[in-house]
């Protein structure tokens, strides 16, 4: 009998405290970019019972009503009832955004390449907003080229939110978490779902039996393909027995604490940088998107079954200090050819990434819940497959 291998990933709903913080940070970023596409923004948010603190650094000509953006975001998520201990129109909002450090700004606004040579290549002008390493990943086990465990985890909490907002399950509250364990065969192909864990906040009147039945029938079976479920699949639904107190009343939340949920569910490596609240000069965000774009096009081109792209930068320097492609032995061509093709086809300077993916637009709030990668419900430029033919041609040359 072949060895059984399990892999687990999780997701959280838009009403989870950390995701509330992410969405507020990205809503502020979008509001600023809508007025000033060249703004530099690093907006952090902390939420807890009855209170929201927004802090960080900005450089912009825009005026944004932070108080209104915060309240509108909370309302859209679904915190409109004082019984939740956190409601859009009654929370205290405490903004404290200051001007970006001139020491950082000088390296971002004029890269080392420009300062050193005096050349005026417009794509050399912007230096990386910080040092760091970023990863992008793709795999052929789902139509969206994402690992199955995190893909299913996102879809489960998104389905819970849809049922809550439509009123079909009226007792649901905004906070929820999911976790999916997938069994893989000896060829690393997913064959079944071993375990599903869902914890969902609810009104006090809802019974455990009712919650379990609704979640299994209306959420799990509606999301997970029947061929992955069998009589041995285990369901843990609200395993603590009660989840009435949730959201910021139950736990404080901070921007950037769900970086594995935001990416690949632990299936791929992560450089450690968070995304939300950061404009595209911050390579933590933009280079992670570029790396995903590259990896997805490599796999979609049939050049590998899975691909991980690492990029690394020095603060104030436009060109990446390293580019690496790892296909884990699944490539149909030499990895050095893939790396050469990537360098030729993708401009990985910050300004090049911004131009390539059109990242000065207010598109970020929609990424701040249910994953930044592999989304099929929203149109994100790093998910496009417009480099497939060019990659094929480049490796054949």
Curated annotation (Swiss-Prot):
GO cellular component, one term: cytoplasm
InterPro entries, A to Z: ADOMET_SYNTHASE_CS, S-AdoMet_synt_C, S-AdoMet_synt_central, S-AdoMet_synt_N, S-AdoMet_synthetase, S-AdoMet_synthetase_sfam
EC class: transferase
Catalytic activity: L-methionine + ATP + H2O = S-adenosyl-L-methionine + phosphate + diphosphate
UniProt-listed Pfam families: S-AdoMet_synt_C (PF02773), S-AdoMet_synt_M (PF02772), S-AdoMet_synt_N (PF00438)
Keywords, sorted A to Z: ATP-binding, Cytoplasm, Magnesium, Metal-binding, Nucleotide-binding, One-carbon metabolism, Potassium, Transferase
GO molecular function: ATP binding; magnesium ion binding; methionine adenosyltransferase activity
Note on how the cofactor is bound: Binds 2 divalent ions per subunit.
Positions bound to ATP: 16, 175-177, 242-243, 251, 257-258, 274, 278
CDD domains: S-AdoMet_synt
UniProt-annotated binding residues for Mg(2+): 18
UniProt pathway annotation: Amino-acid biosynthesis; S-adenosyl-L-methionine biosynthesis; S-adenosyl-L-methionine from L-methionine: step 1/1
Start and end residues of each stretch annotated as Flexible loop: 100-110
Cofactor: Mg(2+); K(+)
HAMAP family to which the protein is assigned, alphabetical: S_AdoMet_synth1 (MF_00086)
Function recorded in the entry: Catalyzes the formation of S-adenosylmethionine (AdoMet) from methionine and ATP. The overall synthetic reaction is composed of two sequential steps, AdoMet formation and the subsequent tripolyphosphate hydrolysis which occurs prior to release of AdoMet from the enzyme.
NCBIfam families documented for this protein: metK
Record's protein name: S-adenosylmethionine synthase
């Amino acid at each position: 009998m072949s060895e059984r291998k399990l892999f687990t990933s999780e997701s959280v709903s838009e009403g989870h405290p950390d995701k509330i913080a992410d969405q507020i940070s990205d809503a502020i970023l979008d509001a600023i970019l809508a007025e000033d596409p060249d703004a530099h923004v690093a907006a952090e948010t902390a939420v807890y019972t009855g209170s929201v603190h927004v802090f960080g650094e900005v450089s912009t000509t825009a005026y944004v009503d932070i108080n209104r953006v915060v309240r509108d975001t909370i309302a859209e998520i679904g915190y409109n009832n004082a019984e939740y201990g956190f409601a859009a129109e009654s929370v205290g909002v405490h903004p404290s955004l200051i001007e970006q450090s001139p020491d950082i700004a000088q390296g971002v606004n004029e890269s080392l390449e420009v300062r050193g040579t005096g050349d005026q290549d417009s794509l050399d002008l912007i230096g990386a907003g910080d040092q760091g390493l970023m990863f992008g990943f793709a795999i052929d086990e789902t139509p969206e080229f994402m690992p199955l465990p995190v893909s299913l985890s996102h879809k489960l909490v998104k389905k819970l939110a849809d049922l809550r907002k439509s009123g079909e399950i009226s007792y649901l509250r905004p906070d929820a978490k999911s976790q999916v364990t997938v069994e893989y065969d000896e060829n690393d192909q997913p064959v079944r779902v071993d375990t599903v864990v869902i914890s969902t906040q609810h009104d006090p009147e809802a019974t455990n039996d009712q919650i379990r039945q609704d979640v299994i029938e209306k959420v799990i079976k509606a999301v997970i393909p029947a061929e992955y479920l069998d009589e041995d699949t285990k369901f843990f639904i609200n395993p603590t027995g009660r989840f009435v107190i949730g959201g910021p009343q139950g736990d404080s939340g901070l921007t950037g604490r769900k970086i594995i949920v935001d990416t690949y569910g632990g299936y791929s490596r992560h450089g450690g940088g968070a995304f939300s609240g950061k404009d595209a000069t911050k390579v933590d965000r933009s280079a992670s998107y570029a790396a995903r774009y590259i990896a997805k096009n490599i796999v979609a081109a049939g050049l590998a079954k899975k691909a991980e792209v690492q990029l690394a930068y020095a603060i104030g320097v436009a060109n990446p200090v390293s580019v690496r492609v790892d296909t884990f032995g699944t490539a149909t061509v030499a990895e050095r050819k893939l790396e050469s093709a990537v360098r030729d086809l993708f401009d990985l300077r910050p300004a090049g990434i911004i131009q390539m993916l059109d990242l000065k637009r207010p598109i970020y709030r929609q990424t701040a819940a249910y994953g930044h990668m592999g989304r099929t419900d929203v149109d994100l430029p790093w998910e496009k497959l417009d480099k497939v033919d060019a990659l094929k041609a480049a490796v054949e040359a």
